[in-house]
Amino acid sequence: MASRKDTLVRRASRVRRQIKAVANGRPRLSVHRSSKNIYAQIIDDVAGKTIASASTLDTDLRFSLKTGADTEAATAVGKLLAERASKAGVKDVVFDRGAFIYHGRIKALAEAAREGGLNF
């Protein structure tokens, strides 16, 4: 029987394989969610570089949020990431939800990033 971590890795690799098929050179917006925080970064897979990143642990957000584990925090991270991406000149990305379902905090971050100007 596969462990929880094995199933998460398998699911994430399945999602990433689908993303590589449709990326067409666009950077990838990768999201990670833990029980206390949420992290997002825009990665250029061709160059192997991180273009922009944001999380609830950033000094811009850390003390202004009640907790890093709710949809309000995810929305703030999405807006901050979109702002940093626009400064870096990125508008079109591919959304990589990893092994997480598109619901709750993941959905809130994605919608806030779209409102901030990212296209995916």
Curated annotation (Swiss-Prot):
Keywords: Ribonucleoprotein, Ribosomal protein, RNA-binding, rRNA-binding. One of its GO terms (cellular component) is cytosolic large ribosomal subunit. It comes from the Bacteria. Signal peptide: none annotated. Gene3D superfamilies: 3.30.420.100. CDD domains: Ribosomal_L18_L5e. GO terms for biological process: translation. It holds the Pfam family Ribosomal_L18p. GO terms for molecular function: 5S rRNA binding; structural constituent of ribosome. The keyword ATP-binding does not apply. The keyword RNA-binding applies. This is one of the proteins that bind and probably mediate the attachment of the 5S RNA into the large ribosomal subunit, where it forms part of the central protuberance. Part of the 50S ribosomal subunit; part of the 5S rRNA/L5/L18/L25 subcomplex. Contacts the 5S and 23S rRNAs. Belongs to the universal ribosomal protein uL18 family. PANTHER family: 39S RIBOSOMAL PROTEIN L18, MITOCHONDRIAL, LARGE RIBOSOMAL SUBUNIT PROTEIN UL18M. This is Large ribosomal subunit protein uL18.
